[in-house]
Amino acid sequence: MNQAVIVAAKRTAFGKYGGTLKHLEPEQLLKPLFQHFKEKYLEVISKIDDVVLGNVVGNGGNIARKALLEAGLKDSIPGVTIDRQCGSGLESVQYACRMIQAGAGKVYIAGGVESTSRAPWKIKRPHSVYETALPEFYERASFAPEMSDPSMIQGAENVAKMYDVSRELQDEFAYRSHQLTAENVKNGNISQEILPITVKGEIFNTDESLKSHIPKDNFGRFKPVIKGGTVTAANSCMKNDGAVLLLIMEKDMAYELGFEHGLLFKDGVTVGVDSNFPGIGPVPAISNLLKRNQLTIENIEVIEINEAFSAQVVACQQALNISNTQLNIWGGALASGHPYGASGAQLVTRLFYMFDKETMIASMGIGGGLGNAALFTRF
């Protein structure tokens, strides 16, 4: 079987909903990343077999193909867009790696993009062509049958209650995320991930959701979103805009082209769970991944779990017995942000730049009751 390696990875800084990137369509968010790869890896770009991107709340119309054309890549390069909700970006990386393993191609660009600010409004179509009632807008599509399709906030509350994750633990984890993120922005670790872009004449190179100077006590002052609950705006991620691209190729070709380091894809798993508890998906996903590769949690140096809500990450940490020295060691989405279709690819990008780590996992909890996880080693 061929081996797939990630040899390059970059992302935009993530803008908050209605923030600096609010006027940019998904293809415009991706364009500078494509152009960066085109300029830096010109010889490789001509060999691309496919572009695979995750996207969740966009306009449809295969954003992967549209974006590569917008960026001036060759007409002969195809593109495919994947929607596995929040797991789309990680799914895109796994898809490209699996295609290389299967011998279907040798060079792929994978990643994801999301503009929550530019997401189209959704209106239910009337049952009758003679309908006279006012249009009915809705926030999102259904992820599961009606009685098993909680809002994401209610889903986080369900997980918190089931796994006994207190408000205090949630706030403490959120504070940790902001502190670790701020620390790794300051020391330059996170800046390695980010390609600075120019937006309206200004350089944009810092995640907008980060609140590095909020005192710990302030997290406890936020009211729960649901009366009597524990999930607040402070221990939940924000809605965000941003894009991520990774260059993935067959290992022997990577060596031939002069790439000397990166991530080797070992395996990936996707599972289903009770859709009332969507955030717990990483638990069986990571467990199955470890079992299939004859590993234990202690064998993994770094585990990146997307921080949609403190409640679900703390629950996963406790269920899997993950130590703080393993989990989200540069912070996470509670501070950096969660651009849905790009977030899984961002986790892999973060692992790519942890040059001193050898064995790593990226995992996502997914709306509708899913979880995915991927195992990487350094090459």
From Swiss-Prot:
InterPro entries recorded: Thiolase (IPR002155), Thiolase-like (IPR016039), Thiolase-like_sf_Thiolase (IPR050215), Thiolase_C (IPR020617), Thiolase_CS (IPR020613), Thiolase_N (IPR020616)
UniProt keyword annotations, A-Z: Acyltransferase, Transferase
Cellular component terms per the entry's GO annotation: cytoplasm
GO MF: acetyl-CoA C-acyltransferase activity
CDD domains: thiolase
Entry's EC annotation: 2.3.1.-
Top EC group: transferase
Listed GO biological process terms: fatty acid beta-oxidation; phenylacetate catabolic process
Active-site residues, as the UniProt record annotates them: 86 (acyl-thioester intermediate), 338 (proton acceptor)
Any Pfam family matching the protein: Thiolase_N
Domain of life, source organism: Bacteria
PANTHER family, sorted: 3-KETOACYL-COA THIOLASE, PEROXISOMAL, ACETYL-COA C-ACETYLTRANSFERASE YHFS-RELATED
Protein family according to the UniProt entry: Belongs to the thiolase-like superfamily. Thiolase family.
Protein name: Putative acetyl-CoA C-acetyltransferase VraB
Gene source species: Staphylococcus aureus (strain MSSA476)
Gene (UniProt): vraB
